[in-house]
Amino acid sequence: MTLQRTFVMIKPDGVRRRLVGEIISRFEKRGFNILALKMVHMDRATAERLYQEHKGKGFFNELINYIISGPVVCMIIEGDDAVSVVRKMIGATDPKEASPGTIRGDYALSKSENVIHASDSEEKAKTEMGIFFQDVTEIGAQARM
């Protein structure tokens, strides 16, 4: 097992439906530490930066408009094999394919309103954490004080 950090974001539908506490509780019960957390109302430029891999795809504008439609909760989560374990916990993007017991399996309404985003690699996690938390290296030290 490797101690890792990953980026997790509760999307506007998750915030609007008051699922923030339940979702955070699932990560804590699994033994993860929440190193940083903040609620933001993302602007278009930040949303486009976060989802730049989808630029040019048919759903890109719809995705960006949805992400900027309301506040999101951004977190840095730390724990053993955080990237892969968190991805398993959130479930498949399409709620029809997400297993019951996963966050999306239990709460997602559609492919677009699927409650949560999590980094899919360590490299992406570093990039995504850097978008919302400028000094990631400082965060770990502060969290352990």
From Swiss-Prot:
Superkingdom of the source species: Archaea
GO (cellular component) term, any one: cytoplasm
Alphabetic keyword roster: ATP-binding, Cytoplasm, Kinase, Magnesium, Metal-binding, Nucleotide metabolism, Nucleotide-binding, Phosphoprotein, Transferase
UniProt catalytic activity: a 2'-deoxyribonucleoside 5'-diphosphate + ATP = a 2'-deoxyribonucleoside 5'-triphosphate + ADP; a ribonucleoside 5'-diphosphate + ATP = a ribonucleoside 5'-triphosphate + ADP
Cross-referenced SUPFAM superfamilies: Nucleoside diphosphate kinase, NDK (SSF54919)
Subcellular location: Cytoplasm
Primary location recorded for the protein, binned into one broad class: cytoplasm
Entry's EC annotation: 2.7.4.6
GO biological process terms held by the UniProt record: CTP biosynthetic process; GTP biosynthetic process; UTP biosynthetic process
Active site (record annotation): H117
Primary enzyme class: transferase
Cofactor(s) the record lists: Mg(2+)
Annotated ATP binding sites: K11, F59, R87, T93, R104, N114
InterPro entries, alphabetized: NDK-like_dom, NDK-like_dom_sf, Nucleoside_diP_kinase, Nucleoside_diP_kinase_AS
Gene Ontology MF term list: ATP binding; metal ion binding; nucleoside diphosphate kinase activity
HAMAP family according to UniProt: NDP_kinase (MF_00451)
Purpose of the protein: Major role in the synthesis of nucleoside triphosphates other than ATP. The ATP gamma phosphate is transferred to the NDP beta phosphate via a ping-pong mechanism, using a phosphorylated active-site intermediate.
Recorded family membership: Belongs to the NDK family.
Protein name (Swiss-Prot/TrEMBL): Nucleoside diphosphate kinase
Organism name: Sulfolobus acidocaldarius (strain ATCC 33909 / DSM 639 / JCM 8929 / NBRC 15157 / NCIMB 11770)
